[in-house]
């Protein structure tokens, strides 16, 4: 039984990137994982992803870029106000304007850059750089 499917997908992306693999198959195809992958695609951390619709949950086929240095899931999922985002950026990212935090907000899943522009906070999900 899996406890954190987002963690499984992020770790498989990190391991495949370190091994130099170009594509991976990750399961299950959950909505939250798809939205996190979309944010990663928007910032060119992955080239593309698609849902392979099979029975029992489905799978994602993810095509990787070589630009991922590190990525991980943030646990526990801290609720963060917009004015406190900088504190978590310095904690999880190596330098200013290098990498993104992925958070879920009332407006959907987005990066810390978009959340700061909209002036909203949310719960931290993951970091990528």
Swiss-Prot record:
GO BP annotations, alphabetical order: translation
Gene Ontology CC annotations of this record: ribonucleoprotein complex; ribosome
Key words of the record: Ribonucleoprotein, Ribosomal protein, RNA-binding, rRNA-binding
A single MF term (Gene Ontology): rRNA binding
Role this protein plays: One of the primary rRNA binding proteins, it binds directly to 16S rRNA central domain where it helps coordinate assembly of the platform of the 30S subunit.
Self-association state and partner proteins as the record states: Part of the 30S ribosomal subunit.
HAMAP family reported in the protein's UniProt record: Ribosomal_uS8_A
Name of the protein this chain belongs to: Small ribosomal subunit protein uS8
Organism: Thermoplasma volcanium (strain ATCC 51530 / DSM 4299 / JCM 9571 / NBRC 15438 / GSS1)
Lineage of the organism: Archaea, Methanobacteriati, Thermoplasmatota, Thermoplasmata, Thermoplasmatales
């Amino acid at each position: 039984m899996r406890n954190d499917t987002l963690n499984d997908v992020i770790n498989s992306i990190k391991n495949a990137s370190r091994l130099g693999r170009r594509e991976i198959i990750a399961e299950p195809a959950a909505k939250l994982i798809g939205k996190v992958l979309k944010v990663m695609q928007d910032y060119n951390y992955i080239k593309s992803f698609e849902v392979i619709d099979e029975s029992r949950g489905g799978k994602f086929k993810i095509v990787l870029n070589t630009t991922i240095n590190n990525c991980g899931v943030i646990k526990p999922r801290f609720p963060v106000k917009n004015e406190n985002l900088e504190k978590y950026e310095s904690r999880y990212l190596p330098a200013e304007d290098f990498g993104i935090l992925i958070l879920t907000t009332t407006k959907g899943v987005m990066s810390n850059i978009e959340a700061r522009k909209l002036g909203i906070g949310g719960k931290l999900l993951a970091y990528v750089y």
